[in-house]
Structure formats: structure tokens, C-alpha cells
Amino acid sequence: MAARLATVACALFLLSSALLRLGCRARFAAEPDSDEDGEETVAFPESPPQKPTVFVVVLARNAAHTLPYFLGCLERLDYPKSRMAIWAATDHNVDNTTEILREWLKSVQRLYHYVEWRPMNEPESYPDEIGPKHWPNSRFSHVMKLRQAALRTAREKWSDYILFIDVDNFLTNPQTLNLMIVENKTIVAPMLESRGLYSNFWCGITPQGFYKRTPDYLQIREWKRMGCFPVPMVHSTFLIDLRKEASDKLAFYPPHQDYTWTFDDIIVFAFSSRQAGIQMYLCNKEHYGYLPIPLKPHQTLQEDVENLIHVQIEAMIDHPPMEPSQFVSVVPKYPDKMGFDEIFMINLKRRKDRRDRMLRTLYEQEIEVKIVEAVDGKALNTSQLKAWNIEMLPGYRDPYSSRPLTRGEIGCFLSHFSVWKEVIDRELEKTLVIEDDVRFEHQFKRKLMKLMEDIDKAQLDWELIYIGRKRMQVKEPEKAVPNVVNLVEADYSYWTLGYAISLEGAQKLVGADPFGKMLPVDEFLPIMYNKHPVAEYKEYYESRDLKAFSAEPLLIYPTHYTGQPGYLSDTETSTIWDNETVATDWDRTHSWKSRKQGHIRSTAKNTEALPPPTSLDTVPSRDEL
């Protein structure tokens, strides 16, 4: 009996335990947990991981002109500054690079996780260099040692990534760092743009370690192929993932024991990467930023300043302007008129974007202009045209689409005509006229001032000088002007992008009384210097002795051509001159006139107008295509 009771008791215990367990499960499944006071306990979701840490290396020498904009781009990277460290070094300066970098570091050190500052005030130059842009072996060695010290510090700090970026590289895309990290490569670089084909990568390398031209380079550089590509060399700006095991084998200095190539920091590092079994990658999926073309060893810091200016103004064609860091002082600019009595910039009031870009572009070049509010062809009506006695030149037809004159072209003509009138009224001896859709050649200001100085010295009798046009005489060379390099006698041309005009030239153009026999202004000018190919048009203008010349090579070009993104024409997208109900929109298919300059035969290229090459021109610049 006792044994049976014990068995029953044991069974009841086991059953109650099972029921308790089932009850607990049911309760947890059906009811939220609560504390002793009856309050519910909620399970919070896990937070995302923090961004990887990035160790940024800044090596600066004679960079007072680039630093404000470089640092501004660095500040605007969309990445938590608390997850970034700055390792900055500067040496061998003849400008105030040290002061600018110190000013910035003091202002931002509280924002970044870690800041290390390594200035060296003396000496100002390397004993074996010929100028501040020269790279003797002593400079290569010093830079490689600095990069190695930075790499060692990044490893000691357990940084996830290290970003090397030259101080004349401008990451204008704020997402660049995030985009490179996402690629998950040991070494990866964003493709940077320059005014030429130069960039921060090689697609080919010879067995001796020299640059090798390949078809792939152009395909990648011009975005004909887009993606992230394996390449033998990236330089100037690149990201290294220090979490990857193979990265432990990377070194900048000393060179690998098997290294026999040229003593150059970027080639030494590419060899190190190869020996470590690490593939370098170059990405061109987006536009990331800009870099200048390297100068030759004999070139000066002033030329480097001009390099920066050109990078800035080229970037503004399709993107917002580069702004300097808010934490450093910027040297003020002092615009002038380059020796002209006046510089006019013609702009439609409704094209504020063009006006703003041009004003900033001209300011960066220290050029002072007066804005001329253009006559808007869209606002012209028949009554106004009659009041001004405007009639189209009989028989005129556009050379490509065979359409008559448009009101947009009339507005353009009247805009230029108003400038000529002001030149006469104010008795301006030497005037420059530019339109609002131009891009400037490298060293524009220096080259134009030198050209005008040479013209004055030669006492050339001139009345019009094109600085931007579309040359239509492509089979034979235009005649070079004796004693003035970079100047030719102008032949038939399209476009009025920019030109210098004298008082006598303005008087001849206004005196031709063109309102009653009007055609586009860029067709009118060749008639006035007797180079228009259509004889019938010339018959309506008796005096055709305008003394017209052109810069060779040209100094300005259109920002966009027909068919390119951003191309816009206010002259062709308009209405017929005498019938505002007939629209003219030939831009997309018929506007050959607005297309890029066609091929000029080698026999037509004017070498007589160019200065002879010097021995310095043959000195190769570092890493130049």
C-alpha cells in the first residue's frame, strides 16, 4: 500500500511539473512579461554597428593655394568625424602651408577621433631639387618614409581603413568614402577627373615598371565602360582595408627586396601590392572629384595656382562650385580688366544659372566684368521688329537646316549690337566681349594678356580678334600674323563666344546699318571682313574691310555641344523671325552649327602661328600621359 501511494505521489509530482512547464510556455507565448509592479518589459531591437574607423593621411608641401578647398572637401565627406583620425605632416615649404594646416587642425581636432600633427619648418627645399615641383630621389624617399610612418600608426591604432589623399585632389562627391568602403576591396580608388585624359590610375605597366598605354584606359577614363576594374596602379587617392590579412604585407618603405624599377613612391607601392598578392581596383561608377595634371619639374608655384583655378572652373560647368573650408582663411582676390577698357558679359536675365556660374568663374580668375542684359528673343514681338525696321537679309537660310532667321538669333544680334553702341558712346579703345556659355582654356588670363601685349608691341592694326569661335576653313591653314605668335588672320567662322573689339571695329559694325538686312551675328561678322563663302550675302554690305584676326589656339570654347547633356540654345529654339506662331527647334537633329569643331586636316593646322618648342617642353612631368 505504501509503495502504491509513493508511486501515485511521484506520478502527481511529475504531472504537476509538466503542467507548470506547459503553463510557463503558454504564459510567455500569450502574455508579456512584467516586473513586480506589473509593468511590461519590452525587448529592444539591436542597434546597427558603428561605421568602420578611417585613418586619413594628409601630406602637404607648398599647398597654401589648394589646402582651403581640399580641406573643405574633406570636411564635407558624409562620414562620422568621430570615426575618422587625421594624420597630417608638412615640410619643405616656401609658402604658409604650415600655418593653414595648423589653423585647421586646431579648429577641428575636437571633431575627429584622433589628430596627429608632424610639421617640419626647415629646410625649405631639397638640396638636389631644381624647383618646388621637382621630384628628386631625396623627395621620393622622404615621402615614402612619411607614408610608411602613417601606415604603421594606423595599424597601431587598430584602424579599419587608411585613406591616402593628395592635397591637390578634391573629393567633391560627399559619398566617396562610403562608396569605396562598400566595394569591399583591399585597395580601391575613386577615378578622379582632370582637364585632359590624366587620372589617378594606370591600365598598363611595362616589365620595367613604366607607364603603358592601353585601349582600356580611354574606355574607363571616358566612362565608356563603368564599374570597378582591376588595374596595375592606383595613386594620389586610394583606400586600403587594413582588416584584410594581406594588407599586413603592404609597405611604402623600404622598397621590396626584389624591387628594381624606377625609384618613385607610387611605383614602389604598386610593386609592394603585387608582391603581397593584392589586386588594386579603380572605380568610375560615379563622378567622385578632380585632380590637376602634374606640372613639369621646371614649373613654378604660380603655375600650380593656375592649375588649381582651372580645376575649379572646370568643375563648375556641371557641378556646384568648390567651397573652401569654413575653418581656414582664404586669400582675397582682386579682379581687374586685364588691360581692356571694359569687359562685357552678355547674359539673358532668365538664365540666372549661367550668370552665377560665369560670375564665379570670372572671379576665380580675378577678371572684372560688366553684365549686359541680353535681348530675349522670346520676348520680341512683331511690333518691336517693325519699330526697329528689322528685316531679314533677302534669301538668307541657315546653312544646315535651310530655315530662315529666328527671333532668338535677332535677340543675340541686338545684344551684341548694344555692346558695340556702348563702345562707341563711351569711346572705348579696347574692349572684350564674352557670352555666358563658355569654358576657359587653361591659363586663360595669362595667355590673353600676353597675346594683347604682343599685339601692342607689334603695333598691329586690328579691329576684331576672336578668342573663341568654330573655324570653318579646315582644308588650308589660316595666315599667321608676322611677329605675333598665337595669332592668325580670321577666315570664315561660326559662333561669337568671345572677341576683342576696337573702337574703329565697333564703328564699322554699327555703320553697316545691319537692321534692314539682318542675319545671325556670327554670319554677319565674316561678311564684314569679306570671308563669307556666300557671295550673294556679301552684296548687301558694300564696305567689307573689317580687320579681323583670331587667337590660335583658341582661348575659350562652348561649355556644351549639340547632343551633350546640358546643351541649350536660345537662338535656335525659338520662332521664325516674322511669324511667332512657327516654332524652330532643330537642336536635337539639325543643329550642326552648334556641334563640336570638326576635324581640321593636318595640312590646315597653322604651325607658323605657334611658338617654337623649348628644351623645357620636352622634360616629362611626373606620371604624365
Swiss-Prot record:
It is an enzyme of class 2 (transferase). The keyword Transferase applies. GO terms for cellular component: endoplasmic reticulum lumen. Its EC number is 2.4.1.50. Glycans are attached at N96, N184, N381, N579. Gene3D superfamilies: Spore Coat Polysaccharide Biosynthesis Protein SpsA, Chain A. Its main location: endoplasmic reticulum. A motif (Prevents secretion from ER) lies at residues 622-625. Residues 597-625 are annotated as: Disordered. PROSITE patterns: ER_TARGET. Belongs to the glycosyltransferase 25 family. This is Procollagen galactosyltransferase 2. The gene is Colgalt2.
